[in-house]
Amino acid sequence: MKSKYSIFCMFLLRGFIFLGTVFSLNSAELRLKDIARIEGVRENQITGYGIVVGLPGTGDSKTPFTSESMKNYLKNLGVEANLKPDQTRNIASVLITATIPTYSRKGDKLNVVVSSIGDAKSLEGGVLLQSPLKTAGDKTYAVASGVISFGGRQEQERGSSSRGNKKTVGVVHGGAIVEQELDQNFYASERVQIQLENQDFTTLNAIVSKIRSILPGKHGIGPESVVPISPSEINIVLGKSFENKSDAFLTLLSDIENLTVETQTKPKVVINERTGVIVMGGNITIEEVAVSRSGLNLSVTDKNRRRNWLGKEQEPTKSSFLIEESTSVGDVVEALNKVGASTKDIIAILEALKKSGALHAELEIQ
């Protein structure tokens, strides 16, 4: 049974973007590769230190190691320079982070995140100089450089003080080039271990049953070889019948990845504080609860009664939000947008609803 969905709301209101998705079904048939991974096939974190140049006077001004780093960088290029901390307003020190897949090859490009570690006001307009990226073992696997870009838009006209408006964190798309491949020992094992992204006994049981019904007939693997070892792990014992990197082994892995199982959709609300985007399932409901937030007044009734939208109060006193049981998160966010609530207000209210137990969904703030 395929999941049907439609976008039910997309609007821009005072610099705040709201996206909602309505799922008509609570379950969906998904491929195994979409909800789990095979052990050994994973991403690895790499990080490094770098310098951003070309800033329009928004760089570091009181960060001594920035001038020292720039001086050493120029020295390696054969240029002698005596920079002082107050002469670095067009450069900034940053930390660089990226993820590298296990099977990345030399020359592959990766996106990198660049974050200011000094007192720079903004990295907008800056260029990251060539910087090595290493793992925890201090081995260089990639080199990053390029123009820093930013997503979303500022909310200054709404009076928001979100740290996302300062633009001290940006992305260099395809800015890192892989120079060294990761060590691989995936094929050394005589088993395949499947790891679910989320612990769920219902999904685990469905996967085990599906694998046991398909593998014996096509690949000659007995049902007893498929063993669940935890709420999120399944072990498939292959023995020596499959040679490493053989066509039969690769076909087996492909068949496992493309098995389809019916899963339950997990209610989730995702908020990106930097860009002001909210994504949620349309059927996420809220129990009856009272919420107070200074300067706003909202009253929402249940689905069988007329809704009453109220704007900002004239008096700067605390206001009450009456949210009836079965009201959806989408209704609440839409109402808050109508009365001019900021991103900070919406995040604070949703966090309070979650902590009180009124919001029955996972809340993720990015």
Curated annotation (Swiss-Prot):
Where is it localised? Periplasm; Bacterial flagellum basal body
The answer to keyword Signal applying to this record is yes
User: What InterPro entries does the record point to?
Assistant: Flag_FlgI
Q: Where is the signal peptide?
A: 1-27
Disulfide-linked positions: none
Q: Supply one GO BP term.
A: bacterial-type flagellum-dependent cell motility
A Pfam cross-reference name: FlgI
Entry's Gene Ontology molecular function annotations:
structural molecule activity
- Give the record's keywords alphabetically: Bacterial flagellum, Periplasm, Signal
Q: Which is one Gene Ontology cellular component term of this protein?
A: bacterial-type flagellum basal body, distal rod, P ring
What protein family is recorded?
Answer: Belongs to the FlgI family.
- What is the documented function of this protein? Assembles around the rod to form the L-ring and probably protects the motor/basal body from shearing forces during rotation.
Binding partners and assembly: The basal body constitutes a major portion of the flagellar organelle and consists of four rings (L,P,S, and M) mounted on a central rod.
Q: Which NCBIfam families match?
A: PRK05303.1
The protein, known as: Flagellar P-ring protein
- What is the gene name? flgI
